[in-house]
From Swiss-Prot:
Family: Belongs to the UDP-glycosyltransferase family.
Listed EC numbers: 2.4.1.273
Residues where UDP-beta-L-rhamnose binds: S291, A347, H364, G368, S369, E372
Binding site for an anthocyanidin: H27
Entry protein name: Soyasaponin III rhamnosyltransferase
Encoding gene per record: GmSGT3
GO molecular function terms noted in the UniProt entry: soyasaponin III rhamnosyltransferase activity; UDP-glucosyltransferase activity
């Protein structure tokens, strides 16, 4: 192990785990799912984030409240960070460099909290490498919990002795140095767009995270993944890493602790269900791009026209549409109202995905989004934007459970015609039937409670095995 001597012995005493996810709801939610699972098993969690983000989280189930302590730490004021911004959803991505500074400004408060609460473990996110020396000063071991699969880590952090050069072609192409064959890659425009997206035009600053420290200085490396999804990638990572690599499973909807009765009685769900009940089985395409992805007007327009041209029934969750900033094509909702719904507030996604009328999904390929959709056996039409989303899209294509909308190699633009063709291919065309069958088979794996309960138990066993007795 890195700089602490872990005992390597099993210990059945309840754990106390401090969690420090990044200031993004797409990171906070999967951390909170782990927190609830730990609490359900009788362990204690101190969950740390900003006040606004904690208020945005789902309520802790009543029976778990004694086990989960939510700690609100106010962010310091940072020049150029908009007033009230506490999450990536509050700002354009080019302002993330200032959100990072605010996050790092929590170090004193986190240090004080760890000293007084003395947890057995700190589970930290990629952006919280700064917590490692703090925790180790109190003899508390650290586990990095990566909410994305192993292929992201392996692809973007290749061994230096395996890279012939660091040209754009070398960085973006399929890794030739792996002991197995893969076709996954990123496109040059995707890499350049991601790089440019980190720069604040006003100050010239970029968001730069010490990923090497976050990955290499932990005592356990935890990932939201499974061998069934990426066994080769996990084997490679485990064989080339100096600390134990532990998949925690996919945390699929069947494992999540939710208030089902409250969801069933939600008025929005009742209205949506009434509409879905009128649709034919496996006929509706569910379209959702998460709460944080900000489409350009050009992309939104082409996407809407493509959905219309497909002539498929659809449910489009478009919560982050800002009236007056982004607009659907004139007359779109009127022309499609007989076969589709544009839902502009929060949508009960899991309830919708479980309905028999859903025949497939269109997704940006965020990890959580993919897991939820494939869990229900749905084929995916992908339109990724961020680098991790692009890789996940290519992995799913490689496994033949998804098809990506064709895009220009120059700038990533796409056409309404290609959107329509891709949707029809995946959802209704005979040529796409193999994809649909493959997705159903993968859904059986993703939804297996027996399988994922074992991953959870192995994860907890690892925390028990490598805890430090004096930290309890």
């Amino acid at each position: 192990m890195d700089s602490v001597a872990l005992n390597g012995k099993s210990n059945d005493k309840p754990l106390h785990v401090a969690m420090l996810p990044w200031l993004a709801m797409g990171h906070i939610y999967p951390y909170f799912e782990v927190a609830k699972i730990l609490a359900q098993k009788g362990h204690f969690v101190t969950f740390i984030n900003s006040p606004k983000n904690i208020d945005r989280m789902p309520k802790t189930p009543k029976h778990l409240e004694p086990f989960i302590k939510l700690v609100k730490l106010p962010l310091p004021k940072i020049e150029h960070l908009p007033e009230g911004a506490e999450s990536t959803m509050d700002i354009p991505s080019k302002k993330n460099c200032f959100l990072k500074k605010a996050y790092e400004g929590l170090q004193y408060a986190v240090s004080k909290l760890l000293k007084t609460s003395n947890p057995d473990w700190v589970l930290y996110d990629f952006a919280a490498a700064w917590v490692i020396p703090i925790a180790k000063s109190y003899n508390i071991p650290c586990a990095h919990y990566n909410i994305t699969p192993a292929f992201n880590k392996v692809f973007f952090d290749p061994p230096k002795d395996k890279m012939k050069d660091y040209s754009l072609a070398s960085i973006c192409g399929p890794p030739t140095w792996l002991p197995f064959t893969t076709t996954i890659h990123i496109r040059p425009y995707e890499f350049l767009r991601a790089y440019e997206g980190t720069k604040d035009e006003e100050t010239g600053e970029r968001a730069s995270f010490d990923l090497n420290k976050a990955y290499s200085s932990c005592d356990l490396f935890l990932l939201r993944t499974s061998r069934e999804l990426e066994g080769d990638w996990l084997d490679y990572l485990a064989g080339n890493y100096k600390v134990p690599v532990v998949p925690v499973g996919l945390l699929p909807p069947s494992m999540q602790i939710r208030d089902v009765e409250e969801e069933d009685n939600n008025p929005d769900w009742v209205r949506i269900k009434d509409w879905l009940d009128t649709q034919e089985s496996s006929s509706v395409v569910y379209i959702g791009f998460g709460s944080e992805l900000k489409l350009s007007q050009e992309d939104l327009t082409e996407l809407a026209h493509g959905i219309e041209l497909s002539n498929l029934p659809f449910f489009w969750a478009l919560k982050n549409l800002k009236e007056g900033v982004l607009e659907l094509p004139e007359g779109f909702e009127e022309r499609t109202k007989e076969r589709g719904i544009v839902w502009k507030t929060w949508a009960p996604q899991l309830k919708i995905l479980a309905h028999g009328a859903i025949g497939g999904c269109m997704s940006h390929c965020g990890s959580g989004s993919v897991i939820e959709k494939v869990h229900f056996g749905h084929v995916l039409v992908t339109l990724p934007y961020l680098l991790d989303q692009c890789l996940f899209s290519r992995v799913l294509e490689e496994k033949q459970v998804a098809v990506e909308v064709p895009r220009s190699e120059k700038d990533g633009s796409f056409t309404r015609v290609d959107v329509a063709k891709t949707l029809r291919f995946a959802i209704v065309d005979e040529e796409g039937s193999a994809l649909r069958e493959n997705a159903k088979e993968m859904g059986k794996v993703f939804s297996s409670e027996e399988l994922h309960n074992k991953y959870i138990q192995d994860f907890i066993d690892a925390l028990q095995k490598y805890r430090i007795p004096s930290a309890s």
